[in-house]
Amino acid sequence: MLGFVNGRLHFMESLAPGLTALQLTLRTGDRTLMESLDLALEPGEVLGILGANGAGKSTLLNVLAGLAAPAQGRVTLDGHALETLAPLTRAQRIGLLPQGDEGGFFGSVADFVALGRYPFGHDSGDLTPHLATWELTELAPRPLATLSGGERQRARLAQLAVQAPCIALLDEPLTHLDPAHQARLLAWARREADAGHSVVLTLHDPNWAACHCDRLLFLHGDGRWQLGTPADLLTPDSLEALYGSGTAALWRRNERVQPV
């Protein structure tokens, strides 16, 4: 099907089910972060987004979640323009794990985790398995503000799990987590994908990306982007182009670059 976007004729891939970006351009001030991205999130995949600080990763997730508008292009959810959908409707399908704090939340850990069911207008049900998964059972009655950074990150992840979105957007979810919980998070992402959901992670470590992502999106922060498999994109030259001279040492190439 053909249609016009920003005055240009395109195949209307945006009418496909799921979350789709068509000719998406992001800018901050007079700087173009990303230009003319076409992206369809596939059910059953983990997509990793890599780029230097300030390259537009968080901005892109906010646009995909419907919390910010692109400079050009459009985002659709099941064929509907994202901006035409009510916030609660979006939240029933799309979950966003942002960076940062909780905006002065003063309740308990259990209360915070239960907010994941707010878009559905009914009680949160049994939180026990989610609290157990993220090792929050003993912390549940404590005020969220008394937790360490890693414990709060686990509470955010539990809240997202309670929301149970079919499209999960996670902004630097490995932040503050110890190695055991980083591995647990990435295993959770794979289980979600295996259940037919779409998972998007912003990452910095190419080795995690190689092992746990089906596709990668590189954002160069100057309008350029690359989309492909880990085998296609994870090379010393591409990493130095993405992050700068000397950063190829971050990549320990392994024969196995497919998701585990």
Roles of regions detected by a PLM:
Residues 50-52:
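The feature captures the beta-strand-to-loop junction immediately N-terminal to the Walker
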Residues 65:
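Helix-to-loop junction immediately C-terminal to a conserved catalytic motif
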Residues 73-81, 90:
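Conserved ABC transporter NBD signature motif
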Residues 124-140:
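Conserved ABC ATPase "signature" region
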Residues 143-147, 151:
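Conserved ABC ATPase signature
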Residues 168-172:
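Catalytic Walker B motif of ABC-type/P-loop ATPase nucleotide-binding domains
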Residues 203-204:
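H-loop/switch region of ABC-family ATPase nucleotide-binding domains
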